[in-house]
A protein has these predicted regions:
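Helix-to-loop junctions at the C-terminal end of transmembrane segments
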Residues: 60-72, 275-287, 372
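C-terminal ends and interior cores of transmembrane alpha-helices
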Residues: 82-96, 298-310
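Helix-loop-helix hairpin linking two adjacent transmembrane segments in secondary transporters
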Residues: 102, 130, 140-189
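Juxtamembrane intracellular "pre-TM" segments in multi-pass secondary transporters
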Residues: 1-8, 192-229
């Protein structure tokens, strides 16, 4: 590993940034559907709120990835947090004045910000060689554990003893705006840019980078790329659709207090990240392939159990399992996609992956909301289970892809 690259320092900073982002995400996951329904009154389209957010994230992912490859990781990530802060302010205004237009505009800005922050894993993958890449990504993602604790601790009290009304959401959204600006300031201290670190590592390993980045049509045909994308798309789509509808299920279907959503979402985010250091080492040891399908299988088990569970503690356990399965599948997919690309190609491939994954998640959130309203929780749980299980079975039948050397 070349000297003087501040890899440990940059890893710690990116982990801190993710902690702040995940704290904000815990609010969004808990109240996106609720915010949309309370402001618009469209209960039958409760999945439209998360769908707007996810569609904006998806459609901006590929341009964001290309921008990262051109301008570097840090400037783009910082811009994303500024947009996120603005989105929170606009959403807060919408809840205060009961403006559906403002809420939708805020969700769009939050979605663009979400696509940027999700691509922080590009920077994480940049800073480590292939044999340590899953662990390196895991070290950055571990910061999210603290965000899972911070989010409910900060936002939960803001909902205590409050009626379920749009006006009770204004202050939490404003608090999230301030946190996003803090994250922007923190990420600007990352030096050198992780893309430059990746280039230095390639030179140090005597790897010759291509003169120009290959087109996406060529990159996706490389060994292991499509299976990794399938796992990432399925795991992300199932995870975000179930996660974003959980708040409405808990409050409206199971008739729990609004504040009870935050421990559940906190448990889910802990599942996503609490064991990430162990998961990273496990993936590097057992290989990317088994981890891709194994994570989806864990998600399927967690989803089907939602059919019978109504209590807050048990729902929290199942959402923890959903997050854990996503962690296993998504980290291994990210590592495999990073293995298959040079530093100049990595951002756009992960951006393409996030484009398809985000559109899948948006579609599933919208369809899941309709299924939930018309057919109930059982239909949502069975549908999510099948969507996780089918690709897991397909991936189990594939021969493992060779691990790239660069």
């Amino acid at each position: 590993m070349p000297e003087g690259l501040n890899i440990r320092r940059n890893t710690a900073i990116l982990a801190a940034v993710l902690a702040i982002y995940v704290a904000v995400l815990s609010l969004a996951a808990a109240v996106l559907s609720l915010t949309f329904v309370l402001v618009t009154g469209f209960r039958s389209l409760l999945g439209l709120g998360p769908a707007i957010y996810l569609a904006a994230a998806a459609l901006s992912a590929l341009p964001v990835g290309r921008a990262m490859d051109r301008f570097g990781r840090v400037p783009v990530i910082a811009t994303g947090f500024v947009l996120g802060s603005l989105g929170c302010v606009v959403t807060a205004a919408g809840t205060h004045w009961d403006s559906a237009v403002a809420v939708i505009a805020g969700f769009l800005l939050l979605g663009v910000s979400g696509s940027v922050t999700l691509l922080i894993r590009t920077a994480a993958g940049d800073m480590y060689p292939p044999e340590r890449r899953a662990r390196g990504i895991s070290l950055v993602l571990f910061g999210s554990v603290f965000g899972a604790i911070l989010g409910p601790a900060l936002f939960g009290p803001l909902f205590s003893d409050k009626d379920v009304a749009a006006s009770t959401l204004t202050v939490p959204w404003l608090a999230a705006a301030g946190m996003s600006l803090v994250a922007c300031a923190v990420v600007l201290t990352v030096r050198p840019d992780p893309k430059l670190i990746a280039e230095r590592i390639s030179v140090g390993r005597d790897e010759v980078a291509p003169a120009t980045a290959a087109p996406l049509s060529e990159i996706v045909r490389r060994p292991g790329v499509l299976p990794a994308m399938l796992a990432a798309i399925a795991s992300f789509g199932v995870m975000v659709s179930v996660m974003n509808l959980t708040g409405y299920v808990v409050v409206d279907h199971h008739h729990h207090a609004q504040g009870s959503v935050f421990p559940i979402i906190g448990a889910h985010v802990l599942g996503m990240y609490a064991l990430v250091l162990v998961i990273g080492r496990l993936i590097d040891r057992i290989g990317r392939g088994p981890a891709l399908g194994g994570g989806l299988a864990v998600m399927a088990v967690s989803c089907i159990a939602l059919t019978w569970v109504e209590s807050v503690p048990l729902i929290a356990v199942l959402l923890f399992g959903l997050g854990l399965g996503w962690n296993l599948s998504f980290v291994s997919a990210t590592a495999q996609l990073a293995d298959a690309t040079s530093p100049a190609e990595r951002g756009k491939l992960l951006g393409l992956n996030d484009l398809v994954a985000g559109l899948t998640g948006a579609s599933l959130a919208l369809l899941g909301g309709i299924a939930l309203d018309v057919l109930g929780v059982t239909a949502l749980a069975i549908g999510a289970t099948l969507l996780a299980l089918a690709p897991a079975i397909f991936l189990a039948r594939l021969r493992p892809a060779p691990q790239a050397a660069g």
